[in-house]
């Protein structure tokens, strides 16, 4: 299996309740909750490290720059934050599930320009329920999930005087809700955006329409095709002065 060749070592840290994973070709280790199934770890690494995957966020028009403040929405295992932290001003890594927030803290330890925000992202502030889906847990109406605090991007950023120059998002289907809670920030900052669209068939068109409603001059580029049903994988958006 290709993913297995991406794992150099996997070391349980029993006292910390974490699994330390060294990926081939990545200098820093990743940390996952100790009980995370091996096949899920392998799939995560496959998605982010295989060269033929469409699950990458930077293209020339949406590349991270040295003065950028980056919102990593759905920071997951922390690879995107690790990749860009050394070449931007600051990264806010946002992830709600407590077990993964703890793991993310170990993965990103020592990076002075990284802040972890332990929230789900939604249209408004409050609380949401997460499914028990591990790293791919998502907002659910089912009664057996974990309740976590939710925040709107606008509450975390523009209303606190923080700008956002780059917005990266993979929220397991909650992307539209996040964007509706980010309208003030997007209107004020016009960030470059890279956002997943494959969780729901209709999201590529809906996200493009929402962004152009906020800023009609946004350029939109959609890339990648899910082999199962042809859904696009990623949407990139940028303004002319960001090209």
Predicted feature residues:
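Phosphate/nucleotide-binding beta-alpha loop and adjacent structural elements of enzyme active sites
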Residues: 1-243
């Amino acid at each position: 299996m290709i993913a297995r060749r991406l794992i150099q070592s996997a070391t349980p840290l029993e006292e910390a309740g974490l699994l330390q994973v060294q990926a081939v070709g990545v200098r820093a280790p990743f940390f996952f909750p100790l009980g995370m199934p091996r096949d899920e770890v392998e799939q995560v690494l496959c998605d982010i490290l295989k060269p033929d995957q469409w699950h990458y966020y930077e293209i020339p028009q949406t590349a991270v720059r040295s003065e950028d403040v980056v919102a990593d929405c759905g920071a997951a295992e922390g690879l995107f934050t690790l990749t860009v932290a050394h070449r931007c001003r600051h990264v806010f890594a946002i992830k709600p599930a407590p077990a993964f927030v703890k793991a993310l803290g170990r993965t990103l330890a020592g990076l002075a320009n990284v802040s972890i925000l332990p929230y789900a992202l939604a249209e408004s502030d409050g609380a949401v329920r997460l499914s028990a889906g591990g790293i791919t847990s998502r907002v659910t109406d089912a009664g057996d999930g974990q309740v976590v605090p939710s925040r709107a991007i606008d509450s975390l950023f523009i209303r606190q005087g923080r700008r956002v120059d780059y917005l990266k998002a993979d929220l397991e289907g909650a992307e539209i809700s996040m964007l509706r809670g980010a309208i003030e920030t997007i209107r004020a900052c016009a960030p470059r955006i890279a956002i997943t669209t494959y969780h729901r068939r209709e999201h590529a068109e809906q996200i493009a329409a929402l962004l152009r409603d906020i800023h009609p001059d946004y350029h939109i580029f959609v890339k990648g095709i899910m082999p199962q049903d042809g859904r696009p994988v990623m949407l990139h958006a940028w303004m002319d002065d960001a090209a």
